[in-house]
Structure formats: structure tokens, C-alpha cells
């Protein structure tokens, strides 16, 4: 599972955790999130997220 970070506000989407409060179950891959989904913290689109490595 990977993690994706919003380059605008720093919000992190963790594929392992999903976002149940947004209707995205745990284990949902980034590719499977709808294209019109937006960052829950700042409202930017998926284009403004980058995959990150957390050490």
C-alpha cells in the first residue's frame, strides 16, 4: 500500500486506511478513487497529490 500527499496542504491519503468518512474503504488504491475526488482539507484535485515514501 502506498501513501499520497497533497502538495498544497500536506494532507496524506494512506491506501491501507482509506477514508471511510469520505466513503472510501480501507485498502482502496489511489487509482480506484474517482477522478473528481478532491482533498478533504483544501479542495484540490487528485492531480495535486504526489506519492510519498514515509521512513
Swiss-Prot record:
Keywords (A to Z) from UniProt: Cytoplasm, Electron transport, Iron, Metal-binding, Transport
Coiled-coil segments on the chain, per record: none
Pfam family, one: Rubredoxin
Single Gene Ontology MF annotation: iron ion binding
UniProt-annotated location(s): Cytoplasm
This protein's GO CC annotations: cytoplasm
Keyword Transmembrane helix: no
Cofactor: Fe(3+)
Binding site for Fe cation: 6, 9, 39, 42
Gene Ontology BP, a term: alkane catabolic process
Induction entry: Constitutively expressed.
Known pathway: Hydrocarbon metabolism; alkane degradation
Cofactor, how bound (note): Binds 1 Fe(3+) ion per subunit.
Chain ranges of the Rubredoxin-like domain: 1-54
InterPro entries xref list: Rubredoxin, Rubredoxin-like_dom, Rubredoxin_dom, Rubredoxin_ET, Rubredoxin_Fe_BS
SUPFAM superfamilies, A to Z: Rubredoxin-like
Function: Involved in the hydrocarbon hydroxylating system, which transfers electrons from NADH to rubredoxin reductase and then through rubredoxin to alkane 1 monooxygenase.
Family to which the UniProt record says this protein belongs: Belongs to the rubredoxin family.
Protein name per the record: Rubredoxin-2
Organism expressing this protein natively: Pseudomonas aeruginosa (strain ATCC 15692 / DSM 22644 / CIP 104116 / JCM 14847 / LMG 12228 / 1C / PRS 101 / PAO1)
Lineage of the species this protein comes from: Bacteria, Pseudomonadati, Pseudomonadota, Gammaproteobacteria, Pseudomonadales
GN (gene name): rubA2
Amino acid at each position: 500500500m502506498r501513501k499520497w500527499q497533497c502538495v498544497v496542504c500536506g494532507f496524506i491519503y494512506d491506501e491501507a486506511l482509506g477514508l471511510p468518512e469520505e466513503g472510501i474503504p480501507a485498502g482502496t488504491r489511489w487509482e480506484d478513487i474517482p477522478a473528481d475526488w478532491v482533498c478533504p482539507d483544501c479542495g484540490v484535485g487528485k492531480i495535486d497529490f504526489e506519492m510519498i515514501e514515509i521512513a
